[in-house]
From Swiss-Prot:
Modification after translation, per record: Activated by phosphorylation.
Source organism: Rubrobacter xylanophilus (strain DSM 9941 / JCM 11954 / NBRC 16129 / PRD-1)
Catalytic residues (positions): S100
Annotated protein name in UniProt: Phosphoglucosamine mutase
KW Phosphoprotein (keyword) present: yes
Listed cofactors: Mg(2+)
GO molecular function, one term: phosphomannomutase activity
Function: Catalyzes the conversion of glucosamine-6-phosphate to glucosamine-1-phosphate.
TM regions (residue ranges): none
């Protein structure tokens, strides 16, 4: 039997769990009530296509109304769509029910500010504290909030996107994979408005097939033959990966390089680009050779977004395809990113394969080392033995490579990532350091 009051903790992308087991409707109600107490006003609520989405978004809306705020249900809509409409409608916050690229039994709840941006961690901690209060004072009579639906939310979001970015690409042959997720509600109509020759797959959501053998996590399954470009979204459409006309993957690193170079050439670069420590070394080298300032952050779209605001960067993101194009979006938006790429193709007359040549991808080896010693991954990574092994590796790799050691924040794992021009050197160094980490972590 479930305990009456469970601890709700925000991770890197909201509160997550298996729906109806690790994440209950009661949890959603408590989070909605906490949001009403923290933000007031109107909280817009969007969701992806998971079977549990209606259940959890209804409970979230009930919590918001119980706290005296107005809940505006956007229905199935990409996360960046909820962000954009929160800002456009003057909402105090946006709530999104989604587990992104995870399988359908999982779900999650995250919040964005009224400006459509990631919440600071201190605000999430405040929501956690408010959600722990089992019996807050609640309004009655006329103080109870309303739950309303915005039926034309997809049309409003599509209009906002096309009003900001409308590449001239009539006749271009485009393949879209909507991951049987939130992109289905809006991406096809946006691309058809552009007059492209459109093929759409992953556009038959049934509540259980989101991300199943489709979308950005399975982009290698797409058959791009007969198309000029393909785009694959994740479940809530805040990321996108591309395939060029030859069927080669254009990941987030290459997309950032393409967009950053174009922005620089047009004098719209601002404070440069923001990437993470796990971005490919080839991206860092490419940006340096182009004279583009680059800020490197820890992994996580929150860190990227905060750094972009701090330095005034125009583009930033992660290899996974979670990319923020600051001129057109406040958070990662797969559809906006795809349109920005099409815009570069249209203005330059170059194919995506030509544009992707802006950077050379360095061979990369990543090993996840499970640790068993008390103190967890952080203590193992900071041990003198491991630090000496990392320093030895840095000396061997020199200017032609690098090593990144990153303890996981969610599991007892240390990630060892090595990049080098020579793949054999890359593999050898990574395996050696991973062995040291394993022995230090009690793995033998």
């Amino acid at each position: 039997m479930e305990p009456k009051e469970r601890e709700l903790a925000f991770g890197t992308d909201g509160v997550r769990g298996v729906a109806n087991r690790g994440l209950l409707p009661e949890d959603a109600l408590r989070l909605g009530l906490a949001a009403a107490r923290r933000f007031g006003g109107t909280v817009v609520i969007g969701r992806d296509t998971r079977l549990s989405g209606g259940m959890l978004s209804s409970a979230l809306a009930a919590g918001v109304a119980s706290g005296g705020a107005r809940a505006l249900d956007l229905g199935v809509l990409p996360t960046p769509g909820a962000a954009a409409l929160a800002a456009r409608l003057g909402a105090s916050a946006a709530g999104v029910v989604s587990a992104s690229h995870n399988p359908y039994p999982d779900n999650g709840i995250k919040f964005l500010s009224g400006e459509g941006r990631k919440l600071p961690q201190r605000t999430e901690r405040e929501l956690e504290r408010l959600a722990r209060d089992p019996f807050p004072e609640r309004p009655v009579a006329g103080g109870v909030g309303r739950v309303e639906a915005l039926e034309d939310a997809p049309e409003m979001y599509a209009g906002a996107v096309l009003g900001a970015l409308r590449p001239e690409v009539p006749g271009l042959r485009v393949l879209l994979d909507c991951a049987n997720g939130a992109a289905c509600a809006v991406a096809p109509r946006i691309f058809r408005e552009l007059g492209v020759q459109l093929t759409v797959v992953g556009d038959a959501p049934d509540g259980t097939n989101i991300n199943e053998g489709c979308g950005s996590t399975h982009i290698e399954r797409l058959e791009v033959a007969g198309h000029d470009v393909a785009f694959a979204f994740d479940g809530d459409a805040d990321r996108v990966l591309a395939l060029d006309e030859r069927g080669r993957v254009v990941d987030g690193d290459r997309i950032i390089a393409i967009l950053a170079r174009d922005l620089k050439e047009r004098g719209r670069l601002g404070g440069g680009a923001v990437v993470t420590v796990m971005s490919n070394l080839g991206l860092l080298k490419a940006l340096e050779s182009l004279g583009i300032p680059c800020e490197v952050t820890p992994v996580g779209d929150r860190h990227v977004a905060e750094a972009m605001l701090r330095v005034g960067a125009s583009v930033g993101g992660e290899q996974s395809g979670h990319i923020i194009v600051a001129e057109h979006a406040t958070t990662g938006d797969g559809i906006v990113t795809a349109l920005a790429l099409l815009d570069v193709m249209a203005r330059t007359g170059r194919s995506l394969s030509e544009l992707a040549g802006v950077m050379e991808v360095y061979p990369q080896v990543l090993v996840n080392v499970r640790v068993e010693r008390d103190g967890g991954a952080g203590r193992v990574a900071a041990s003198g033995t491991v630090e000496r092994a990392v320093e030895d590796a840095r000396r061997e790799l020199g200017e032609r490579g690098r090593i990144v050691l990153r303890p996981s924040g969610t599991e007892p794992v240390v990630r060892v990532m090595v990049e080098h021009e020579d793949e054999e050197v890359c593999r050898r160094v990574c395996e050696r350091v991973a062995g040291v980490v394993s022995r230090e972590g009690g793995g033998g």
